[in-house]
A protein has these predicted regions:
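Start-of-domain marker
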Residues: 35-102, 113-115
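Sec/Tat signal peptide C-region and signal peptidase I cleavage site
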Residues: 30-34
Length: 184
């Protein structure tokens, strides 16, 4: 009866192989779609009085999701390879009637230092003209062919700039193709 025992072991092995293959294909398809940015967005609206704060909370959530969930290039980034960046936006003026935001933004991006546990900042810039229209619950969509929204244009510009510069830190001219897209 040792013959029957071998057959059961073989079937279990085949099932395990099948399960392992299935799990690997899930992992690969998941990592293949990992976006490039790991952005943190903060909205400082202390200078704006008498406005419902929910519009600023919604802006923060919308920007965070847009920057992190949009696939900016066709490059494959693992989740742990995503570029850590910060968009610290200070609202200096907000017109409720026109949904116009006048802001300045401090944008920073970091990368890991090779063979160490710390990171270094490779991009740090203040944009004093980070101005756009945004109505609460607006959905942001980016089409590189037709840029019809100032907020998506600003996000795309900085996303391409950060990704391109990050690629340049790994190899000379490594980000040239992506940086070229900033000019569009």
């Amino acid at each position: 009866s040792s013959h029957g025992k071998g057959k059961g072991t073989m079937i279990r092995r085949q099932r395990l192989k099948w399960l392992a293959t299935l799990l690997m294909s899930f992992a690969i398809s998941f990592s293949a779609n990992a976006q490039e940015l790991n952005a943190t967005v903060t909205i400082n609206h202390n200078q704006i009085q008498g406005t419902d704060a929910s519009v600023f909370d919604n802006l923060k959530e919308t920007l965070t999701n847009f920057l992190n969930d949009h696939q900016w290039t066709n490059l494959k980034f693992q989740k742990n390879e995503r570029i850590v960046c910060n968009f610290n936006i200070t609202v200096t003026k907000y017109d409720v009637a026109t949904n116009m935001f006048t802001c300045k933004a401090l944008i920073q991006a970091n990368r890991p230092v090779f063979n160490s546990s710390y990171t270094t900042t490779f991009y740090n810039n203040t944009d004093n003209d980070f101005n756009f229209e945004f109505a609460q619950f607006d959905q942001l969509a980016f089409n590189e062919e037709v840029i019809d929204n100032q907020l998506t244009a600003l996000c795309a510009y900085y996303a391409f700039l950060i990704i391109g510069m990050d690629l340049d830190t790994f190899s000379p001219m490594g980000g040239e193709d992506v940086l070229q897209r900033c000019m569009n």
